């Protein structure tokens, strides 16, 4: 039929079109795989849009043409045989068609169906195109926005460019002006520089001239001084000769008179002889001759003018009886003078005698004192006159020190003394004075200073020889020395007469005489020495002379008249009685011995006056006052220490007036007995008297007081002891007055080295620590100038030896700076601080080295301060003082430096130590001394990173390079057990941590400190967060590091093969010991499990010691502990080391212990475990009692077996270890018996799995779980510490900066491990997580980072890539049909799964491994090919998502898929879930953790067991619509698009996992869930482990974990249980001992997504 034939044509054409469409679709599919829309440019997108529009138009035209063509063909075929002319045929056709309607097939295919099919296809294409156009349009909009922003930025750029040009123009103009000004200024600078040079040249010339003038002036001054001395000497000689001649003249006149009388007598005798009697003249002549002889030695002539008679010669034998009663009488002149008190009212010191062999100034009295009645005042007129008989000249040599002290002679033997003294009539007493007229020659006044020093040498304690000036000298011996002494006394008295007012005053009453006993009596004779004037009782008072009224503005107050006991038989020559106290002379004791005996205080009947600040002694107007120089104590030797020492003689008593109150101890001063041979001119040589002071002394009246402070300073600066003592005796004078520069009198005296002036000022209570304007004290000045005597004196008066000036200079620093060895020694013996630093950071060591003074440096380093401040015997040599002179001869190491290493290594502002200074200046000797100190650090850098060797001269460099030092490596050794259990490839058996420097002088204490410090610094360095070497941690004083290791962790130290412990000392020094034993290294052994400690385990594994101790406590306390974590987390090592430690602890207390290790595999069954427990006595029969044996069972690799099957029957007996909870086990012979676990059994297990799932959760609550998370301690920092320890070992304890390639390589390996685990956790593949064990074998090779990259490629290909591939395939197929489908998926993955695996490997490789590699990019490209998956193109990941979408996904679904998503796990078995019914949801993006109580957990477990079978049936019945491959690709896309991986701590462990259910109508439970907007479909599951970093977990609670995927479960949850769990969750508190429940993110989003899904599915119904 034609209709049939026509109907076949459309079929054929349709088939061809279908084939063409299929071909086009196949081509399009192939093109899509290679075509990436995301990578097209703007022009390419436009071209694509135009092509697509043209294609649509062409399709529309083709459709219209096909419609028209088919319509014509159909009409022709249908109605071609009919026409309108025959209606009957049409009726017949209609009839036939109606009749055969049911039988007849259609003539051709319905065009409408074809069009509908075409339109449906076009609609699909249009939808796809619309989506691409929408995406392109959005990108185009973004592009336009960016264009607008770019234009705005360009406009701003143009504006800024214009401004910049303007500013450039302005700046250019300014720069040109500045350049011109700079040129002008440079010219001016040059001119000024030339002028300055000229001025400097002139200045230099002037300086030279000034220096020449100064030299000439100094020479002239010296010449004038010499000439003046010569003139004074000549004047003194002239005066002496004049006095001698005058005395000779007087004697000759007297002799002439005698001769005249004799002539007269002879004439009379001749006359008488002429007259007759021949016998009488022969008898009278001898008698007269005898009389003449006696008269020649009798008392001198007494003229009618002179009423005061002084005994000048030996008394006549025929004297009256009153002479015997008063053997020591002093004549008095009532009309001209007043009696003078012999001693001051404040005199209280028994002064030791003076032993001066070469001086003539000691005046010795030999007299017999009488004891008057108590009512009589014991006084002397005119002082203790030396005119008493007998007299001893000063030239008499002193007795030896061992001479016995003379005894006091009673008055009964006075006649004997007089008779003995008569034999010395030829020795003239030096107290006779020639008469002087009031108008004294000024030359005599000027020479007074010269005479005073020698005249007063007679009695340093103030005794003077005075007589009335009007009395002539009686004839005595013609000795020149006596004449010279007489002349000096005459000048002194004359000057005293003319310098004082002619006013008489009485002596102060109540002042008894204190006596000092001379040690120089004549042969067999007794001599008494009267005491000197007293000293002011004012702190440490000086020996002050009697106050001269001529120097005071106010006269001394009047005193009661002195009572004098007169003899009636001799009224004109009556003298006061003198009572002298005799004391035994000190012959062997040091100076300064004082006796205070207040029991012997005499009672005075005179009225008592209060003490005054100074001593006022009235003087006779005739000039009988005590001279000021009589007590100046020139050249006196001070006592060693001010204070009370032992008395001179216990039998001697000291007379002290009761009116005197003592405030402090007094340092007695006397002439030096330690320096025999001191010259008489000590005052002149020590005082430095200047002629400029002469006019003051030449003036007759008193000087004004206004200029006295300045005069005091001048006297102290010039060393004028005379003037200084006179000034100090005045009242109202400020002795602490300082001039403009702040210099006090004490400062000036100390600076110029005037020891006597310093002593006077100190006794006068001058401020010893007064500082000038620069902060320098007198001690500083004396130490800087090198005046050791002044320094010694100031130190004795408690000067501040550590006083620092404004610049920080101490006296020790100044002494070292100027190289004053004696001052340094004195200061060090006084205990000064050697470590005081100046403002510039210099110490005394710097100062000593800077001057190159070897002796000063040796003193600083080796001189020890004495244990006691007072050296009782100064002559004994100090055995521990470093010998400065023989330092080179002493054996090295015999003297230990006293300065610490910190002081030797102290750096100044520039970072220079003393060694830097010595080396740079070429002071080789100083550098050698510094190098002898064991603590010197020659490698210390300054601020410019220069060592001592860098700045040293050639000689010093040679010295540094050849130092006597041993460099011995310090190592920490690992035990064999730790190496075997840990893996010998992972770490070296010995780690070198430092190189010890041992020198000859190193002591065992220094060696111990060095070893302990090196260990402490090493432990701190490897446990720190950054890279820093041992030099950087010396300031850290913490005893333990963050990993818990310290000095207490050391078990023993091996010096070669000899064991040594810190603090132990051998007879030999460390240098000799190590040399002798040939020790090449020092090995440290840490306390390990064998000693019941875990320190060695901590160092081997880098797990902090507190955590290991906590693990050990858990095992000992709970008995059942399981260590779990990712593979490679050292679970087996930790369990084994803890077991070893427990074993040795138990054995130490007397128990036997055994460790049983069992490796669990898939074939390990429960029966084998029962047999293991019974065989090792862990399970014992109920009837049997437990023994004392301890058993530790370690079950390794429990992840290879099912925990519920293996340990299910042991849970209750293990938790309750008693006979009350037994378990029954069947033996091999068929019988059964009850067993129980005893308390002496410990069970530890290890699981290399990050989380538990399924039925294994039932075991969880019965054990204590220790979780070893990769992102928490101890695993988080373990790899870092381990690799850092490797680097320390390679560099022998010295680490470079973080920029060093080795440090970068170690940091890269560490980041690879962290980033890899972070990415794997983000992908939801916890089974692929790696512990740090695989990375411990990372090679650390300095300078060869390629080795580390090669090692990383091997690790990637052998371990990481296979684990990642397996985990990705497991995740991609986890929701497929369990059983065969999953197995086939792993063995034969589909193309999509292979693409996902390759993409995951490529992304992990680029994001985690290659990122941060220290190699350059060009070099790194050579190694990329060695990594598996490195060549996979990432563009396929983007195109993969377009063909992976399911039907019905629209724009809304895509919006949902970009939200945070929960990754699904690979585990087929379900876990319990807890939904969140809260409307608000969880706002926090991170995981919230809530705790359920024990009841809720138990109810869940019971529900889990009841509904287990129902869950499996539901899983088989449900058709899951989500595609995990697409989800993985989304995650990979997000990871690939992120520029940098976020911090692992901020990555959420899960995202919302949204699923659609196409067959929800077949599941009533889930259709109800969908319709209920408050009930989410996908349940939130419980993660099995806690996310806390705590390692102590509860036995009875479930745990959750961050960073791992969850297991899907679709169990129908009753509302009541859900509500109960929700309420319990809200009530519970967060705790590590409760179950951790993981709640997902916002539930509102999930509900909204499900409602959208429902709307999408409605049109399909």
Swiss-Prot record:
Annotated region described as Disordered, given as residue ranges: 1-27, 206-226, 329-438, 454-477, 493-612, 876-896, 1444-1480, 1555-1597, 1614-1661
Asymmetric dimethylarginine: residues carrying this PTM: 497
A cellular component term, taken from the record's GO annotations: cell cortex
Phosphoserine, modified sites: 1522
Chain intervals with Basic and acidic residues compositional bias: 1643-1661
Highest taxon of the lineage: Eukaryota
Keywords: ANK repeat, Cell projection, Coiled coil, Cytoplasm, Methylation, Phosphoprotein, Repeat, Synapse
InterPro entries per UniProt: Ankyrin_rpt, Ankyrin_rpt-contain_sf, Cortactin-Actin_Reg, Cortactin-binding_p2_N
Repeat positions for ANK: 707-737, 741-770, 774-803, 807-836, 840-869, 910-940
Major subcellular location class: cytoplasm
Matches recorded under Pfam families: AAA_lid_NAV1, Ank, Ank_2, CortBP2
Stretches of the chain forming a coiled coil according to its record: 124-280
Functional description taken from the UniProt entry: Regulates the dendritic spine distribution of CTTN/cortactin in hippocampal neurons, and thus controls dendritic spinogenesis and dendritic spine maintenance. Associates with the striatin-interacting phosphatase and kinase (STRIPAK) core complex to regulate dendritic spine distribution of the STRIPAK complex in hippocampal neurons.
Assembly and binders: Interacts with CTTN/cortactin SH3 domain. Interacts with STRN, STRN4/zinedin and MOB4/phocein; this interactions mediate the association with the STRIPAK core complex and may regulate dendritic spine distribution of the STRIPAK complex in hippocampal neurons. Activation of glutamate receptors weakens the interaction with STRN and STRN4.
The protein's name: Cortactin-binding protein 2
Species the sequence originates in: Loxodonta africana
Annotated gene: CTTNBP2
């Amino acid at each position: 039929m034609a209709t049939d034939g026509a109907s076949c044509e459309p079929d054929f054409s349709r088939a061809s079109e279908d084939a063409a469409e299929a071909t086009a679709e196949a081509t399009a599919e192939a093109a899509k795989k290679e075509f990436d829309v995301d990578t097209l440019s703007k022009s390419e997108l436009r071209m694509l849009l135009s092509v697509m529009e043209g294609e649509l138009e062409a399709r529309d035209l083709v459709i219209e043409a096909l419609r028209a063509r088919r319509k014509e063909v159909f009409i022709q075929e249908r109605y071609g045989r009919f026409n309108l002319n025959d209606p009957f045929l049409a009726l017949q056709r209609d009839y036939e068609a109606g009749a055969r309607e049911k039988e007849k097939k259609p003539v051709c295919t319905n065009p409408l169906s074809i069009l509908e099919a075409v339109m449906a296809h076009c609609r699909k294409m249009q939808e796809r195109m619309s989506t691409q156009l929408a995406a392109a349009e959005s990108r185009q909009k973004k592009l336009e926005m960016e264009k607008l922003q770019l234009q705005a930025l360009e406009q701003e750029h143009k504006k800024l460019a214009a401004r910049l040009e303007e500013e450039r123009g302005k700046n250019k103009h300014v720069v040109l002006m500045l350049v011109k000004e700079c040129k002008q200024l440079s010219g001016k600078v040059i001119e000024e520089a030339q002028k300055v040079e000229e001025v400097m040249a002139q200045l230099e010339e002037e300086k030279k001239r000034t220096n020449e003038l100064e030299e000439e002036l100094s020479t002239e001054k010296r010449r004038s001084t010499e000439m003046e001395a010569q003139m004074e000497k000549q004047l003194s000689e002239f005066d002496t000769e004049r006095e001698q001649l005058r005395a000779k003249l007087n004697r000759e006149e007297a002799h002439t008179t005698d001769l005249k009388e004799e002539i007269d007598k002879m004439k009379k005798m001749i006359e008488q002889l002429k007259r007759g009697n021949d016998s009488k003249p022969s008898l009278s002549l001898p008698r007269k001759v005898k009389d003449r002889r006696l008269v020649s030695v009798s008392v001198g002539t007494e003229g009618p003018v002179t009423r005061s008679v002084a005994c000048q010669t030996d008394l006549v034998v025929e004297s009256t009886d009153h002479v015997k009663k008063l053997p020591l009488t002093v004549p008095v002149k009532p009309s001209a003078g007043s009696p003078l008190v012999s001693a001051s009212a404040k005199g209280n010191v028994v002064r030791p005698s003076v032993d001066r062999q070469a001086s003539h100034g000691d005046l010795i009295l030999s007299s017999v004192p009488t004891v008057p009645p108590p009512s009589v005042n014991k006084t002397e007129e005119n002082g203790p006159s030396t005119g008493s008989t007998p007299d001893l000249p000063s030239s008499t040599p002193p007795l030896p020190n061992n001479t016995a002290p003379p005894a006091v002679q009673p008055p009964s033997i006075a006649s004997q003394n007089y008779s003995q003294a008569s034999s010395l009539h030829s020795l003239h007493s030096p107290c006779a004075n020639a008469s002087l007229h009031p108008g004294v020659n000024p030359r005599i006044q000027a020479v007074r200073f010269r005479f005073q020093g020698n005249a007063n040498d007679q009695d340093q304690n103030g005794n003077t020889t005075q007589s009335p000036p009007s009395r002539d000298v009686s004839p005595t011996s013609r000795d020149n020395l006596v004449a010279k002494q007489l002349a000096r006394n005459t000048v002194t008295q004359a000057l005293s007469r003319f310098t004082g007012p002619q006013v008489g005053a009485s002596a102060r009453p109540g002042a008894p005489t204190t006596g000092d006993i001379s040690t120089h009596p004549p042969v067999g004779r007794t001599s008494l020495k009267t005491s000197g004037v007293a000293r002011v009782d004012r702190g440490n008072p000086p020996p002050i002379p009697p106050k001269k009224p001529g120097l005071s503005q106010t006269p001394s107050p009047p005193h009661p008249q002195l009572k004098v006991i007169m003899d009636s038989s001799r009224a004109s020559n009556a003298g006061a009685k003198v009572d002298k106290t005799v004391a035994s002379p000190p012959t062997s004791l040091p100076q300064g011995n004082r006796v205070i005996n207040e029991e012997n205080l005499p009672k005075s009947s005179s009225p008592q006056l209060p003490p005054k600040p100074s001593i006022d002694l009235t003087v006779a107007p005739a000039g009988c006052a005590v001279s000021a120089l009589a007590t100046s104590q020139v050249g006196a030797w001070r006592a060693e220490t001010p204070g009370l020492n032992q008395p001179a003689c216990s039998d001697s008593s000291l007379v002290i007036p009761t009116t005197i109150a003592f405030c402090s101890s007094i340092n007695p001063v006397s002439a030096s007995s330690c320096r025999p041979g001191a010259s008489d001119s000590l005052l002149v040589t020590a005082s430095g008297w200047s002629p400029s002071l002469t006019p003051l002394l030449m003036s007759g009246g008193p000087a004004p007081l206004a200029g006295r402070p300045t005069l005091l300073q001048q006297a102290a600066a010039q060393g004028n002891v005379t003037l200084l003592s006179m000034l100090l005796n005045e009242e109202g004078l400020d002795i602490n007055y300082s001039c403009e520069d702040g210099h006090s009198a004490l400062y000036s005296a100390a600076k110029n080295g005037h020891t006597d002036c310093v002593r006077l000022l100190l006794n006068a209570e001058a401020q010893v620590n007064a500082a000038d304007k620069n902060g320098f004290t007198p001690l500083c000045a004396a130490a800087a100038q090198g005046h050791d005597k002044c320094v010694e004196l100031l130190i004795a008066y408690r000067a501040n030896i550590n006083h620092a000036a404004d610049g920080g200079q101490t006296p020790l620093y100044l002494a070292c700076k100027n190289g004053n060895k004696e001052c340094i020694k004195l200061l060090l013996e006084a205990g000064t601080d050697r470590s005081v630093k100046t403002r510039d950071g210099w110490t005394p060591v710097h100062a000593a080295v800077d001057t190159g003074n070897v002796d000063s440096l040796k003193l600083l380093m080796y001189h020890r301060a004495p244990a006691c401040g007072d050296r009782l015997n100064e002559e004994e040599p100090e055995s521990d003082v470093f010998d400065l002179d023989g330092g080179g001869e002493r054996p090295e190491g015999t003297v230990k430096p006293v300065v610490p290493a910190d002081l030797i290594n102290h750096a100044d502002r520039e970072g220079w130590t003393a060694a830097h200074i010595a080396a740079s200046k070429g002071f080789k000797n100083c550098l050698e001394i510094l190098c002898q100190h064991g603590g010197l650090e020659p490698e210390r850098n300054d601020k410019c990173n220069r060592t001592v060797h860098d700045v040293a001269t050639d000689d010093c460099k040679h010295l540094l390079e050849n130092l006597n030092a041993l460099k011995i490596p310090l190592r920490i050794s690992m035990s064999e057990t730790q190496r075997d259990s840990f893996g010998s490839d992972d770490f070296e058996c010995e780690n070198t941590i430092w190189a010890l420097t041992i020198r000859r002088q190193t002591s065992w204490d220094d060696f111990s400190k060095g070893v302990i410090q090196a260990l402490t610094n090493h432990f701190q360095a490897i446990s720190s967060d950054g890279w820093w070497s041992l030099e950087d941690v010396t300031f850290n004083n913490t005893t333990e590091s963050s990993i818990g290791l310290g000095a207490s962790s050391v078990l023993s130290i091996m010096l070669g093969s000899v064991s040594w412990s810190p603090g132990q000392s051998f007879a030999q020094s460390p240098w000799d010991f190590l040399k002798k034993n040939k020790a090449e290294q020092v090995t440290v052994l840490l306390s390990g499990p064998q000693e019941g400690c875990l320190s060695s385990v901590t160092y081997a594994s880098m797990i902090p010691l507190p955590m290991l101790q906590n693990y050990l406590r858990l095992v000992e306390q709970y008995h059942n502990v399981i260590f779990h974590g990712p593979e490679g987390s050292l679970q087996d090592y930790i369990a084994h080391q803890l077991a070893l430690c427990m074993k040795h602890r138990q054995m130490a207390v007397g128990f036997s212990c055994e460790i049983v290790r069992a490796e669990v595999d898939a074939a390990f069954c429960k029966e084998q475990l029962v047999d293991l427990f019974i065989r090792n006595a862990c399970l014992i029969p109920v009837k049997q009692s437990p023994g004392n044996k301890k058993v530790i069972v370690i079950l390794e690799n429990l992840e290879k077996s099912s925990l519920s099957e293996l340990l299910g029957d042991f849970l209750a007996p293990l938790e309750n270890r008693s006979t009350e909870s037994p378990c029954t086990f069947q033996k091999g012979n068929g019988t059964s018996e009850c067993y129980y676990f005893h308390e002496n059994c410990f069970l530890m297990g290890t699981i290399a799995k990050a989380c538990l799932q399924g039925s294994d959760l039932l075991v969880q609550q019965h054990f204590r779980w220790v979780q070893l998370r990769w992102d928490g301690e101890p695993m988080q920092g373990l790899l870092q510490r381990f690799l850092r320890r490797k680097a320390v070992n390679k560099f022998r304890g010295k680490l470079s900066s973080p920029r060093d390639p080795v440090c970068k390589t170690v940091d890269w390996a560490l980041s690879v491990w962290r980033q890899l685990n972070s990415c794997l956790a983000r992908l939801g593949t916890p089974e692929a997580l790696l512990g740090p064990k695989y990375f411990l074998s990372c090679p650390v090779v300095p300078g060869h980072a390629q080795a580390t990259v090669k090692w990383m490629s091997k690790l990637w290909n052998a371990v990481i890539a296979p684990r990642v591939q397996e985990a990705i395939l497991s995740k991609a197929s986890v929701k497929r049909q369990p059983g065969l489908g999953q197995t086939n998926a792993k063995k034969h993955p589909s193309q999509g799964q292979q693409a996902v695996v390759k993409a995951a490997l490529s992304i992990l490789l680029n994001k985690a491994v290659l990122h941060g590699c220290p190699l350059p990019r060009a070099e790194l490209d050579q190694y990329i090919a060695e990594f598996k998956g490195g060549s996979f193109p990432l563009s396929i990941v983007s195109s993969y998502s377009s063909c992976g979408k399911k039907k019905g996904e629209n724009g809304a679904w895509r919006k949902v898929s970009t939200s945070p998503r929960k990754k699904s796990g690979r585990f087929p078995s379900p876990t319990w879930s807890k939904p969140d019914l809260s409307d608000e949801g969880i706002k926090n993006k991170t995981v919230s953790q809530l705790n359920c109580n024990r009841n809720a957990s138990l109810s869940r477990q019971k529900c889990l067991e009841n509904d287990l079978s129902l869950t499996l049936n539901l899983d088989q019945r449900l058709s899951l619509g989500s595609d995990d491959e697409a989800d993985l690709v989304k995650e990979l896309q997000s990871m690939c698009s992120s520029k940098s991986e976020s911090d692992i701590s901020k990555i959420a462990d899960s995202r919302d996992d949204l699923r659609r259910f196409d067959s929800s109508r077949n599941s009533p439970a889930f259709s109800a869930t969908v319709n209920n907007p408050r009930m989410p479909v996908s349940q939130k599951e419980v993660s099995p482990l806690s996310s806390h970093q705590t390692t102590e977990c509860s036995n009875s609670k479930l745990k959750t974990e961050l960073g791992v995927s969850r297991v899907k479960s679709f169990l129908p949850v009753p509302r009541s249980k859900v509500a109960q769990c929700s309420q319990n969750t809200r009530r519970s508190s967060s705790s590590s001992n409760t179950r951790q429940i993981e709640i997902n993110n916002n539930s509102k989003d999930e509900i909204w997504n499900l409602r959208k899904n429902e709307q999408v599915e409605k049109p399909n119904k």
